[in-house]
Design a protein with these regions (language model features):
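Extreme N-terminal starter segment of soluble prokaryotic enzymes
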Residues: 5-7
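Acetyl-CoA-dependent GNAT
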Residues: 10-14, 20-33, 38-111, 120-122, ...
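C-terminal "cap" of GNAT-fold acetyltransferases
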Residues: 65, 95-99, 133-147, 151-182
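Charged catalytic carboxylate motif
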Residues: 18, 118, 145
Length: 182
């Protein structure tokens, strides 16, 4: 992991199988301890299959980014990803042209190494280039690590909504940041 380079790039359709595995792995690392095995299995099966990832990659309303680690041998592995997209916006989210930060996950082994920051900074650059005035997201009310990370980037809580994981209805905080804030 040390000094080998990590690059952030736009995902390609050929990344879909690896992105599917990464999405499932990072979601499980983050939420397995807080949900039933049945609910996790159902959600992961519905959200992280290769065809869904491929559809998200080619969707013109979406930008899917991957963080790729390159070993000195030339071998590569996906270690994180992020997705921003336009679409339905909750009423609590301000702005005339908001974008959603749909997902931002990094493998636990890479936490604290700047990968999440690189992904977030790339998302902010893309959002600005698209004329976005507000970037918003939903984060589980009990995911304090993620909430702290988002606050460092100027996100504030603007509301909440339900997130259904299997049979469990959970509360996500809606957080947003004005893009004029730098």
């Amino acid at each position: 992991m040390g000094s080998a380079p990590v690059i952030v790039r736009r995902a390609e359709v050929t990344d879909a199988p690896a992105l599917s595995a990464l999405g499932a792995a990072t979601f499980r690392e983050t939420f397995d301890d807080s949900n039933t095995p049945e609910d996790m299995a159902r959600y992961v099966a519905e959200a992280f299959f290769p065809e869904q990832q491929a559809a998200d990659i080619v969707d013109p309303r979406s930008v899917m980014l991957v963080a790729e680690h390159r070993e000195p041998t030339g071998a590569t592995a996906l270690i994180g990803y992020a997705q921003i997209r336009s679409g339905d916006v909750p009423a609590e989210v301000p702005g005339a042209n908001p974008l959603e930060l749909k997902r931002l996950y990094v493998l636990r082994a890479w936490h604290g190494k700047g990968v999440a920051q690189d992904l977030m900074n790339t998302c902010l650059t893309i959002a600005r280039a698209r004329g976005c005035d507000t970037l918003w997201l939903g984060v589980w009310e009990h995911n304090t690590r993620a909430q702290t990370f988002y606050r460092k980037y100027g996100f504030v809580r603007v509301g909440q909504h339900d997130f259904v994981l299997g049979t469990d209805v959970q509360t996500d905080w809606l957080m947003a940041r004005a893009m004029s804030d730098g």
